[in-house]
From Swiss-Prot:
Gene giving rise to this polypeptide: ATG15
Top enzyme category: hydrolase
Official protein name in the record: Putative lipase ATG15
Catalytic machinery residues: 331 (charge relay system)
Catalytic reaction annotation: a triacylglycerol + H2O = a diacylglycerol + a fatty acid + H(+)
Organism expressing this protein natively: Yarrowia lipolytica (strain CLIB 122 / E 150) (Yeast)
Alphabetical UniProt keywords: Autophagy, Endosome, Glycoprotein, Hydrolase, Lipid degradation, Lipid metabolism, Membrane, Signal-anchor, Transmembrane, Transmembrane helix
GO MF annotations, alphabetized: phospholipase activity; triacylglycerol lipase activity
Length: 549
């Protein structure tokens, strides 16, 4: 049963009264949960309550457009069952070690850029801002937003019927037409990849009163940059992207990064073919059919990166309640930045991010209807020689597939700012061009002007897949079982009597019900059917004796 899951639809005329009553009861229960959470009665996943804070977004009378940022904290949220939050307050010792690592990793062009401007990527990053009108929720405290996300997940049919309180506000956004600003945000995104030392600089900020206070590195990491300009209200969160062993030396987060990549950017749990190991059990067994309810549950699970990013944002708003927050990141970090920006209506700048429109819709993230593109607060920077950003890193022979990454999305939300390096420089599609240092040194710094940010072209991901809800799948299974029983009974009552008194033994094939395929190969051929049919009819023809009287 194929349906558009992202559009409000009316129930079919054949809906029974009991099913209608169930929908009404479910709606009332979901609304009650949503209201209770929004009133502040939520206990964050069994942990000690962290105050839900809405950053003070009142602009100063004459805000300065020039800012200078320095890293002050590094947050980490692991994705194990016993989730711990780690925060390192940056010390002078750490800055000196990070500077050395940064100079070893960044290209010479970046060295010259920083030296010529008397700036260091860890102590002084220049940014320019501008005031822009943005339409977003009036009530954006984490408790309220997360209660909505939970309600939308429990009853997605109500998503289109919810009435949101939208408000237009003037906020500070990054000036994406300024070259220094775009480069500085990219350097922040690259800093999130730098390995952090296991020293006494770390401070445990676990929300739990008791329990382990360890450091686990296989999760989400975010660097927090604070504006050093007096009176400035800005903080930037830089989220780490994918660490992939096939692209670099890898790291502690490789396994979790890969799992979240395959969950966020594949059509159905990385079910590319029967040869692939899926990251969740949402594939129904029918060709190109996936359980949408299962997917939404997996995306919002506690051990997934989107949930971890929400918790990092909650921590930062608690630490800086009077600051406005921007977010940036590269690759996976860029996609998570855009999703976080969409969730809370904050400015987000991503670099070479995979298409994140599909998970944005699956999570029912709030998006104001009918806003002009001039009010868009999410920007995606990329170039035409990056197969991940362009959405073409798929197929059996692609680098992503060889490495076990199911990168099947290409659609972005927000504005696209694309450098045409294929035409201008003669580049070819290559995974090497996806690296953040290649982007900084050979693209952002090689152009005198930033790329124009324009609305993305019409786009649709996973057009050949059929996404069904759990209830729809159950109804389809019931209909198939009814068909089986009907055809079986009709084939049994097939004996007829005539006036002839002889007995004839004939080999006849009973009319089998339509077989249900439970497993297909990579090109769609069924290789295993429903075991009920085999048990009922066997593998050979049935010999039926018909008596003619």
């Amino acid at each position: 049963m194929k349906q558009d899951l992202y559009k409000e639809s009316s129930p079919p005329p054949s809906t029974t009264k009991s099913k209608g009553l169930y929908v009404i009861v479910a709606a009332l229960v979901t609304t009650a949960i949503y209201l209770l959470y929004s009133q502040g009665y939520s206990n964050t996943h069994g942990e000690k309550d962290m105050p839900s804070v809405v950053p003070n977004l009142v602009l100063p009378a004459n805000p300065s457009s020039d800012h200078s940022f320095a890293v002050k904290h590094i947050y980490h949220h692991n994705t194990e069952a016993d989730a711990n939050h780690g925060r390192m307050d940056v010390s002078g010792e750490w800055v000196r070690a990070a500077q050395k690592a940064q100079h070893l990793n960044l290209g010479q062009d970046t060295h010259r850029y920083m030296a010529s401007n008397a700036r260091d990527p860890y102590t002084n990053l220049p940014l320019k801002s501008r005031t822009q009108k943005v339409k977003r929720w009036r009530q954006r405290d984490p408790d309220h937003v997360e209660s909505y996300l939970e309600a939308a997940r429990l009853n997605p049919q109500l998503y289109g019927a919810m009435d949101f309180d939208w408000v237009e506000e003037d906020i500070l956004v990054p000036d994406v037409t300024d070259r220094d600003t775009v480069v500085s945000l990219a350097v922040m995104a690259s800093n999130a990849y730098v390995d952090v030392p296991f020293t006494g600089d770390w401070t445990n900020v676990s929300w739990k009163e008791t329990g382990g206070i360890g450091w686990q590195s296989d999760g989400v990491r975010g660097h927090i940059f604070v504006d050093q300009t007096p009176g400035s209200p800005l903080v930037v969160i830089a989220l780490k992207g994918t660490s992939a062993a096939i692209f670099d030396s890898g790291g502690d987060t490789v396994i979790n990064d890969k799992t979240n990549d395959n969950l966020l950017f594949s059509c159905c749990c990385a079910r590319v073919s029967y040869l692939w190991n899926t990251v969740c059990d949402c594939y129904t067994g029918e060709s190109y059919t996936c359980d949408q309810e299962c997917l939404e549950k997996e995306l919002y699970a506690e051990d997934r990166y989107y949930r971890a990013v929400l918790d990092i944002y909650r921590n930062v708003t608690h630490l800086y309640p009077q600051k406005q927050i921007w977010v940036t990141g590269h690759s996976l970090g860029g996609a998570l930045s855009a999703m976080l920006g969409r969730t809370y209506g904050i400015p987000a700048v991503g670099y070479e991010a995979p298409g994140e429109l599909l998970p944005t819709k699956r999570l029912h993230l709030p998006s104001p209807p009918g806003i002009p593109w001039s009010q868009e607060h999410i920007w995606h920077f990329g170039h035409t020689a990056d197969p991940i950003f362009m959405g073409v890193c798929n197929g059996a022979s692609s680098s992503c597939s060889i490495g076990g990454y199911a990168m099947e999305t290409s659609c972005h939300s927000g504005l696209q700012c694309m450098y045409d390096v294929v035409t201008d420089k003669g580049w070819h599609l290559s995974m090497v061009n996806h690296r953040i240092h290649t982007v900084i040194d050979e693209v952002l710094l090689a152009y005198n002007e930033t790329a124009a940010c324009v609305p993305p072209p019409p786009c649709q991901d996973c057009f050949n897949w059929n996404f069904v809800m759990g209830n729809d799948k159950d109804d389809d299974d019931k209909d198939k079982k009814k068909k089986k029983k009907t055809s079986t009974s009709s084939s049994v009552v097939s004996k007829t009597k005539t006036s002839t008194s002889s007995t004839v033994a004939t080999n006849t094939m009973p009319s089998l019900p339509d077989p249900t395929c439970v497993e297909r190969n990579w090109y769609g051929k069924c290789i295993r059917y429903d075991p009920e049919i085999k048990q009922q009819y066997g593998d050979s023809h049935t010999v039926t004796h018909v008596t003619m009287a």
